[in-house]
From Swiss-Prot:
Assigned GO CC terms: extracellular region
Organism (species): Protonectarina sylveirae
Function: Potent mast cell degranulating peptide without hemolytic activity. Shows potent histamine releasing activities on rat peritoneal mast cells. Its mast cell degranulation activity may be related to the activation of G-protein coupled receptors in mast cells as well as interaction with other proteins located in cell endosomal membranes in the mast cells.
Family from the record: Belongs to the sylv/frat/paul family.
Single GO term (MF): toxin activity
Tissue: Expressed by the venom gland.
Transmembrane segments: none
Keywords of this entry: Disulfide bond, G-protein coupled receptor impairing toxin, Mast cell degranulation, Secreted, Toxin
Keyword Metal-binding on entry: no
S-S bonds: 7-21
Protein name: Sylverin
Localization, UniProt: Secreted
Keyword Secreted: yes
Amino acid sequence: SIKEKICKIIEAKIGKKPPFCP
């Protein structure tokens, strides 16, 4: 999903999953 892609991008940038990502 788009949300999953955004989560992966953010995770790659900050090195951890954002709180709104499973």
